[in-house]
Amino acid sequence: MSVWNYVVTAHKPTNVTHSCVGNFTGPQELNLIIAKCTRIEIHLLTPQGLQCICLQPMLDVPIYGRIATLELFRPHGETQDLLFIATERYKFCVLQWDTEASEVITRAMGDVSDRIGRPTDNGQIGIIDPDCRLIGLHLYDGLFKVIPFDNKGQLKEAFNIRLEELQVLDIKFLYGCPKPTIVVLYQDNKDARHVKTYEVSLKDKDFIEGPWAQNNLDNGASLLIPVPPPLCGVLIIGEETIVYCSASAFKAIPIRPSITRAYGRVDADGSRYLLGDHNGLLHLLVITHEKEKVTGLKIELLGETSIASTISYLDNAFVFIGSSYGDSQLVKLNLQPDTKGSYVEVLERYVNLGPIVDFCVVDLERQGQGQVVTCSGAYKDGSLRIVRNGIGINEQASVELQGIKGMWSLRSATDDPYDTFLVVSFISETRVLAMNLEDELEETEIEGFNSQVQTLFCHDAVYNQLVQVTSNSVRLVSSTSRDLKNEWFAPVGYSVNVATANATQVLLATGGGHLVYLEIGDGVLNEVKYAKLDYDISCLDINPIGENPNYSNIAAVGMWTDISVRIYSLPDLNLITKEQLGGEIIPRSVLMCSFEGISYLLCALGDGHLLNFVLSMSTGELTDRKKVSLGTQPITLRTFSSKDTTHVFAASDRPTVIYSSNKKLLYSNVNLKEVSHMCPFNVAAFPDSLAIAKEGELTIGTIDEIQKLHIRSIPLGEHARRISHQEQTRTFALCSVKYTQSNADDPEMHFVRLLDDQTFEFISTYPLDQFEYGCSILSCSFSDDSNVYYCIGTAYVMPEENEPTKGRILVFIVEDGKLQLIAEKETKGAVYSLNAFNGKLLAAINQKIQLYKWASREDGGSRELQTECGHHGHILALYVQTRGDFIVVGDLMKSISLLIFKHEEGAIEERARDYNANWMSAVEILDDDIYLGAENNFNLFTVRKNSEGATDEERSRLEVVGEYHLGEFVNRFRHGSLVMRLPDSDVGQIPTVIFGTVNGVIGVIASLPHDQYLFLEKLQTNLRKVIKGVGGLSHEQWRSFYNEKKTVDAKNFLDGDLIESFLDLSRNRMEEISKAMSVPVEELMKRVEELTRLH
């Protein structure tokens, strides 16, 4: 059953909603504080060289609320700033930095909600009087809430003042007023905009008419900027004019039509401001003045940035641009323009996936691991983002080299901690590379090696020696003098095909199934044993994993013909174990290794499959056989160590790192395309590095310790709103909109675009009609037709209509990389959703669900969509999911309903519905009986089909079984997983749904077995007692389902972010929880670590 769900964040919010600058962590420290809706980040500005600064992260914490206000202020008597935060659910807190503990502590907290009152339409406003006499909040229409400070800087009890103006657009405190004074920008009932000022009388708890007012401003006036002393007054930013206003002055300048989204003050005296508009243009506004008298305004275009939601001027011409529609940026404003005339230089980009309007889960590499491709950003900052889980390689150096056949690292002395040489083998030669003094790879020589032939294997050996195996000999060379000391030759007429070695032993195989075992002494190579096997040998390994680090008692041998892997004893080469691998694919690489004290034999096949066995070191027995698919090409296996633990690198077309946790083997993708060979290369300049050979180049790099999400960005310059993938044609199709600034008649152009799924280039475009929007997209096939099609649902959005009255369904086929329109069908409304349904097409058109069949035309020619049946009864059917004959509909305001298609009657009927009023934003089917919904108050809920109900009335109700406040606006759910699903993992069998949100969150909802749910619920309850929310905010309240009508505790949903934070606790706190639950700490850690593998 999918009743018990675990909700966890795979990618944190990245949409920057607020930012401010001040001295928060110390009187002399300058901080940038960033809010990302439900998280705050504190950064320290540190100089980096003379010309640059760096943002050093100090803290990143969740807030149990959606941040509505973020302001720094400094009450009397404080040496550094405090941080005021107010949330959308009417909680506030004042935070202070605790230098000792490097964390924030709560100075004050409270609830400012009123029982009655209509929440403001234009969002909450929170402001602080510049002289720190009070905090002002506009939360409900017609009310202004005041929280006064006492003379010690402590907050006193809040009170409300009636505010006549109902449609408030902005409120700010004015500087330099003897009594606290606010300036209010509002709209009257004739849609004209005005500004008024009020003094706040703390004694009378009321307003007194202020010093001035200004009527009939620019109709687009939307932002107030209070100007500090000595000038004081306020700037009123409109769409076509900017006005400076004070009791004694009025100055205005016209500007090019634009909507200003954000501003940042440059100087303390307030004479210069940065303005960011809806097109991402950054302007500098200057107030010209003679002493305290304002003489005029000037505005200048500086250049382009991401579309700014916040602008924070840092220092020395460095500016932080926070964005909700694109990546946030650290920019520098230069005195001289660049070649394109821009004064803006982007120094750093901070990835933002928001808003994720749509996404699809694809397996582009076809190896059982989902990648999420999102439609991210908006307007000119629109992009596709490819998000995948994996291990990153940080490149340190690289050289171009073609045709590498093998690589080994060697030391110049047995006890040397670092490697010196990197031996690289090619088809007819061997080269030796080493690091020079400049830390670059350069070619060198080991004189005793044969460099005219391909090397099959080499290794460090005891007594400061090196061993090189080629097709005709084994050479033993001094690592200090580099001279040849001894050589063993292959028998005449035989050549060595495969070989392996360790510090004291060499094992090699020649044609005809001959196996030869040599031992290495000081300057001598002794042939100890020879055996003739019944088939040719494909791979060998004698990696010592027993007691002696230099000597192995057993050898692993992979065979041609009988497709087996065998264990032989050393030195006498007696067969101990033989394991048939089955199938026809030969083993290409075998490796004995030890993880967490367990010995394994890994055996890689030529088709990208990997078998692993537990290997008994005493008996040589192989048990517990498991098989996974890592790629499609042959794999070569090598061990390397990272953080003092053994890992295995499997090089192939899908390189993978194999490691062990809780005594289970785990597999992580490496974020590289094909890798043919890898070997550890631990040099002083780049400790713990790996040498990696891929197509045409050799790279030296270090490896990430942990796997995490890696994000690749494909900037589009337009806004992709819908996406679908078609595996058969290896393409994506998008519905996108391009905004043009120049052409005023038609500022938007809508397209269907086809992209190649490997290069992500546009390969074909179909323009939609004027006013026609792409609303839905689907890749599907129809009954008795083997082709695969893209279906696009559109709407004609006419300026004079409230709701579209017409649209189209377009059916395309991809031929030679081009979109060919095969059929189109007019509809009587917007096609909000398209689903493949029993070989037909199910469309949601305004309030109707309509089923189309794919039928031949009467003229017997091509095919067309023909109406089959439909179902009315929705306000707007926006989101539809299907399973078998069931149809689940998410309505604009009538929550979720369940329909069924009846084959006999050829009709669609309603089976059940949820009678709550939920304004839906996404739906998904978890299993036959449980449906998941997200709605516009940032909640998740699940409903259950009540098939067993005794009466019709009971059966017609979808019963709400789970409720949870996510705090995120979900745009889409999709089934899928971000991690490789493995047979031996506990979480491998847990079904997961991925979601994407406006703030750029990618999350996972996992349906748990009931016993696991109960265990984790108990852990969550105990964690709530130990982990206190920042600012005293309550976790329980935050996760309670909340809308205008009701607030109820979360049920049947668990907060995975809270549960996984168990792993970050100190040992003492872990023990506290362990005691409360009577479960050992190790067991708790193990169970929580398993959960982290869901994402």
Swiss-Prot record:
Pfam families: Beta-prop_RSE1_1st (PF10433), Beta-prop_RSE1_2nd (PF23726), CPSF_A (PF03178). SUPFAM superfamilies: Quinoprotein alcohol dehydrogenase-like. The keyword Nucleus applies. Keywords: Nucleus, Phytochrome signaling pathway. GO terms for molecular function: nucleic acid binding. One of its GO terms (biological process) is protein ubiquitination. Its main location: nucleus. The keyword Nucleus applies. Coiled coil: none annotated. It is found in: Nucleus. Component of light signal transduction machinery. Involved in fruit pigmentation and fruit nutritional quality. Acts as a negative regulator of fruit pigmentation. Probably acts by participating in the CDD complex, a complex probably required to regulate the activity of ubiquitin conjugating enzymes. Repression of photomorphogenesis is probably mediated by ubiquitination and subsequent degradation of photomorphogenesis-promoting factors such as HY5. Belongs to the DDB1 family. Probable component of the CDD complex, which probably also contains DET1. This is DNA damage-binding protein 1. It comes from Solanum cheesmaniae.
